[in-house]
């Protein structure tokens, strides 16, 4: 039996989500031939323990270097100071990096992996190369374009890309060109293009609606149109996103615009319905009284509810997450309004805007205007989305499993 090590970077949920889609494909096709180990830290480590309660001995906790949260994404100032100084309850980053590389190296020595799969963990690429272990790196960025305000991050981008280069195979979790959402985040050098494979998006496949309709689904099924406003990211990012949304809703142009806000938080106290009468209702009460609503707030949507929302909404407002963009643009053929947090998001939304699949909005005023533009030119967006959706490749996990099998055989 072959042993595979999966190293999951703990910043955000995207790396974890992608790896779990891949794990399912591995278990469906190779479970009798491979033994999976996973390594991460923090919240993602806890999620791995919950996901694999019978295999806790194969889940390894190694603290990986991550930025410090700021008001909107990572704090550049605090993260820079943290390189040599303790900051926000964290030890100096230099000591974290040293311990992280040492512990991952020891894990390699102890487990004798036949293959490693790294999603976001570039340090593991370097360790694998030094130990002559075959290595796959899964990504949607290599040398992303930096906007003028972030030029000082360029040395870090070069450092990360040089470690990505050390992988045996670089897997891009996106459709091949010219339908690559993350195109502006790649910019591969000629010397490594031969090891790059565009495998397709790591989709979880179609959602089977096996449960009775929830109150949320009942509330949205017979309305004329509404927007799906997603709140994702770390705590501080969620807070500022919600504040921006509220400011947008208070503008005169938005007084009649229906919206469903998903808070991505398992806090049922967030669940409420705002009627056009200005009163607030519970979900059950709103359904029973057939309330004509203007806003629905949901703490957490089930997979079935999310699928229903995406099927019925007219557009989605998101931060530019690669996974979410693929699901909405490709899977559901719905236009997006993108409000970016990172340059990675800005690049992906800009790519979308350049192809008339959505709109980039960096201010509240632009967000409000974007809603109007989508309503006024909806048919044009639908035509472009129809072509993009036809070429949306969802075979990422299946194609990656084929590559894994070939690398293990060779």
Predicted regions: what is each one?
Residues 77-118, 122-123:
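Conserved nucleotide-sugar donor-binding subdomain of glycosyltransferases
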Residues 393-410:
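C-terminal alpha-helical cap of glycosyltransferases
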Residues 204-315, 346:
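Donor-nucleotide binding loops and adjacent catalytic segments primarily
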Residues 116-119, 303-348:
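A donor-sugar binding/catalytic signature common to diverse glycosyltransferases
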Residues 34-95:
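Conserved nucleotide-sugar phosphate-binding/catalytic loop shared by glycosyltransferases and other
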Residues 8-20, 236-239:
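A short, glycine/small-residue-rich beta-strand->loop->alpha-helix junction that serves as a flexible
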Residues 130-203:
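Active-site-proximal region of nucleotide-activated glycan assembly enzymes
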